A protein has these predicted regions:
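Phosphate-binding loop of NTP-binding sites
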Residues: 86-219, 223-232, 415, 419-421, ...
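ATP-dependent carboxylate/acyl-activation modules
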Residues: 105, 312-314, 432, 437-438, ...
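Acidic, Mg2+-coordinating active-site environments of NTP-dependent enzymes
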Residues: 67-74, 178-325, 349, 374-383, ...
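Residue-level signal for inorganic ion chemistry
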Residues: 9, 38, 57, 90, ...
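N-terminal leader/targeting and accessory segments in enzymes
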Residues: 1-89, 93, 346-347, 374-389, ...
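Conserved beta-strand scaffold positions in the cores of enzyme catalytic domains, especially
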Residues: 17, 77-79, 102, 127-130, ...
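Active-site beta-alpha connecting loops in nucleotide-dependent enzymes
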Residues: 47, 311, 329-402, 430, ...
């Protein structure tokens, strides 16, 4: 992070400065990460108030506090009306000072994969700062911007949301030069009320575009006509070869990875992706469109996409002989599960979906879980094993098997691994379902078998 002074921050934040002026070299909302030179931001939530931990921040070595009321502590304090808004303005200040080219990405699914693809492409051009983990909300976005350093030519920002207005705020901080909506699908319906609500929330990302900024959307999405009515022309598509960014001659190789020709306004390039699934062609098109908008070369697009390594929990493939295990456990929206099933069908041997609950689907939950089961059956999967309250609907629709706990499920899965000479397993579920527990069981079994 660039060095800032408290007196300067007081002006930017319209804050009351209590105590002396000091240099600030780090900003944190977590008392466990504090040290000399750090500003501790005391956030408030429905179930917590970090003002209660400011004495711990002082003991941990913090040099100053950002608070909403003066505290009886011997430490400099910046007093503001809203510490969350104050944190955002700090991130915006650093973004303006460093002034990298910024690519912002949102979508109901695939946004992290697009972020990783774009980061790999832009690293071929220069230093890149990218969103780490799930730092994609109204707290994580400013904390990411605060990590910017003078050497960063680019920033790749993932913007998520679980309520209206959140992306409008974070995009106003990031001020992207290009922004991508990867898709709009049934995810976080509880927070937005309907698919139309998700569309409006994701579309907020374009409100913060810098002057001359480029809006990029998925022309295969049902909301494409509405984006087109708004004058958006930069689109990518797997199905419509009239779009500026599209693919042709798509084929999946023996590892399930796509080989295809990417067509862009800057020319064509032959590509072989390093991660499986036809759906990742669309993700690659989105990433390419965003990076080319920031000035990357087509050569960097090819090099970055072909070098990109799988991300843990994001369609990460492990193989032991004829056993293929796909760990896609980080999260699950309906569309990402359907895409995962499609990718599984291209793999070899006995095909098994191990599935946990999806979350935040509201009244649509039962129907959407059943939709997954119907798709698995239509695609001819050999087995569907489910665990969780809602995934029972998936098992019923797929004529699969439902289990009360993961241990019971794994017993049956282990029998399948023993029985079938070649087997491919996709493990999928929402973050709250912790389906990585099943992945660990399989990995531990295989590693112990090879010892």
């Amino acid at each position: 992070m660039m060095t800032l002074r408290l007196a300067e921050l007081a002006q930017v934040l319209d804050a009351r400065l209590i105590g002396g002026d000091h240099e600030i070299t780090a900003v944190s909302t977590d008392t466990r990460t504090l040290g000399k030179g750090a500003l501790f931001v005391a956030l408030r939530g429905e179930r917590f108030d970090a003002h209660d931990f400011c004495d711990q921040a002082l003991q941990a070595g913090a040099s100053a506090l950002l608070v909403e009321r003066e505290l009886p502590l011997a430490i400099p304090q910046l007093v503001v009306a809203d510490t969350l808004k104050g944190l955002g303005r700090l991130g915006k200040l650093v973004r303006e000072r460093i002034n990298p080219k910024v690519l912002a990405i949102t979508g109901s699914c695939g946004k992290t994969t697009v972020k990783e693809m774009a980061t790999a492409i832009l690293r071929c051009e220069g230093e890149v700062l990218a969103t780490a983990g799930n730092f994609n909300n109204e707290v994580g976005v400013p904390l990411t911007l605060l990590r910017l350093e003078p050497q960063h030519r680019f920033a790749v920002m993932e913007l998520g949301a679980n309520h209206p207005g959140e992306i409008a705020w974070t995009t106003s901080l990031a001020r992207p030069d290009a922004a991508i909506i990867n898709n709009v699908a049934a995810a976080h319906l509880e927070g937005f009320g309907s698919l139309e609500g998700v569309f409006h929330a994701k579309s907020e990302i374009f409100e913060g575009l810098s002057e001359g900024g480029i809006a990029i959307v998925n022309a295969d999405n049902e909301f494409w006509p509405k984006w087109r009515e708004r004058g958006i022309q930069c689109a990518f598509s797997l199905e419509d070869q009239s779009q500026p960014f599209h693919a042709r001659d798509i084929a999946l190789n023996g590892q399930g990875c796509a080989e295809f020709v990417m067509v862009t306004p800057q020319g064509e390039v032959n590509l072989t992706l390093a991660i499986p699934g036809r759906h990742n062609v669309a993700n690659a098109l989105a990433a390419a469109a965003g990076c080319l908008a920031l000035g990357a070369s087509l050569a960097s697009v090819k090099a970055g996409l072909e070098q990109m390594a799988p991300v843990k929990g994001r369609f990460c493939v492990q193989r032991w002989g004829s056993l293929t295990l796909v760990d896609d456990t980080y999260n699950a929206s309906v569309e990402s599960v359907l895409a995962g099933i499609d990718a599984l069908t291209a793999m070899g041997g006995y095909k098994v979906l191990v599935f946990g609950d999806m979350k935040e689907l509201g009244e649509e939950s039962a129907a959407q879980h059943a939709r997954v089961g119907h798709h698995a059956r239509e695609q001819g999967l050999d087995a569907v094993l489910t665990v969780g309250e809602q995934s029972r609907h998936t098992a019923d629709a797929a004529a699969g098997r439902h289990f009360d706990n993961k241990a019971s499920l794994f017993e049956v899965l282990a029998q399948m691994i023993n029985t079938h000479q070649e087997i491919s397993i996709l493990v999928k579920g929402a973050r709250g379902s912790r389906m990585e527990d099943i992945v660990k069981m399989v990995v531990d079994r295989q590693e112990s078998a090879t010892c």
